[in-house]
Amino acid sequence: MSSLLKTDFNVSKYRLIAQKREANAVEIEAALEVVREFIIKKKLILYGGIAIDYALHLKGSSIYPEGERPDFDMFSPNHVEDAYELADILYEKGFKQVGTVRAIHVQTMRVRTDFVWVADLSYMPPNIFDTIPTLTYKNLKIIHPDYQRAGLHLAFCFPFDNPPREDVFSRFKKDLQRYNLIEKYYPIPVVPVKSTYESKTFSIPFKQVAIHGFAAYALLYQTLNELRITCKVPEWKTEFPQPSYSYHKNDKNITLTVDMPRAYPALVLATYNPEGVIKEMGLHLTEICEPYMDYSPPIFKTNDIHFFSTMFKELAISIIQDNLIVVSPQYLLLYFLYGAFATPADKSLFLFYYNATLWILEKADSLLNIIQKQTSPEEFTRFANTSPFVLTTRVLSCSQERCTFSPAYRISLANDVQQSQLPLPKTHFLSNSLPDISTLPYNYYPGKGKEKPTNFNYEKNLLFNIGGKCTPSAM
């Protein structure tokens, strides 16, 4: 019997060959050079895979093969007008079939020529754009890897986002590889920060919410310590915080006592129904904060508890001691990065806790290796599936109207409603959650003779209020 020839599955190699042999390869390369010059001129900030690749080039590494066609993703504080301007430039230079269209990600505009995408421009509010850390590679501004980490953690926090290509299938492996490279070449230095603590007691429902923030760190640390004792490993010497907690429960609530930093004494909870939980708990809403890009959701603040809204999302969670629902370590890491970005005065504190959480995961991994050697594969799999220290697809259960319905889905539904001229029934679970599509950016095609849309109003559409601004509540 003849043996089969060995197949070369080097995808990158064949992608390069395919790009070079495309009929319009020369035109695409020329268009990308125009885009590159535009990015430099407008001082826009590259992000995504290309930013990671360029940052790694500065360290002698990469994620893409040499010569691969760049995929330009960029942030702009005026992305709609910039996208229109780039389309005009390409059209004036003689490129064909030029157009700018709204992407699936609502804050992104895509520019194409000859039906090939050459640029994605995403909105970043000026207050963030002007302060975000960057590096420079060949005259191009790229987002600093410290900020890029946040986007990589994000996919692990919401495993069922972006259906039908859910992140658990399409992003987990790729983002983990990229994160490990960033951690290797751009580690965040450990700078100890001394904090004073106070013991705080909170009464919270044991359904609909997940413990987050500094309290979640305390729960994860003590769970790690209990696992260390079980594995009979000597106590570690560490400079990282070692807060403690205790709790008891009744039929409806959990009373949690936990060591909290005096600078941040409020308990943070994640929930898909913040206003409902606040009402159920009899609390008074004092302040509402808009999202901070994709990295922090709307925050509903009361005097002692801050609620991170995960409405329309399914948040990855863990269960500790069969009773306590806690956010995944990935969401906690994202929280500490968000804190470092949004509150520069306490950046060192949040980054210290970020590194402390990484340390917890590192030590947990060493303990899991011990357990794996001492148990059967079946027993270890069962144990790992309930561990709070591993990537998980267990999510905070939610009612139908508050599950995974992305802005893209709701915009698509709003388009269908507009075209059919038939409103959703008032009883439909999304009847009060459809965006006003008349306030979204318009597509633009320079060669079709239609007048270019002007003066897009970012403040008029809530989907673009993503600068983290907080306002007192009228409630």
From Swiss-Prot:
Function per UniProt: Polymerase that creates the 3'-poly(A) tail of mRNA's.
UniProt KW Transcription keyword: yes
Main location (coarse class): virion
Organism: African swine fever virus (isolate Tick/South Africa/Pretoriuskop Pr4/1996) (ASFV)
GO cellular component: virion component
Cellular compartments annotated: Virion
Protein name: Putative poly(A) polymerase catalytic subunit
Keyword Transferase (UniProt): yes
Pfam family, one: Poly_A_pol_cat
EC number in record: 2.7.7.19
Induction: Expressed in the late phase of the viral replicative cycle.
UniProt entry keywords in alphabetical sequence: ATP-binding, Late protein, mRNA processing, Nucleotide-binding, Transcription, Transferase, Virion
GO terms of biological process kind: mRNA processing
Species classification: Viruses, Varidnaviria, Bamfordvirae, Nucleocytoviricota, Pokkesviricetes
Highest rank taxon of the organism: Viruses
InterPro entries xref list: PolyA_pol_cat_su
One of the record's GO molecular function terms: poly(A) RNA polymerase activity
Family note: Belongs to the poxviridae poly(A) polymerase catalytic subunit family. Highly divergent.
Catalysed reactions, semicolon-separated: RNA(n) + ATP = RNA(n)-3'-adenine ribonucleotide + diphosphate
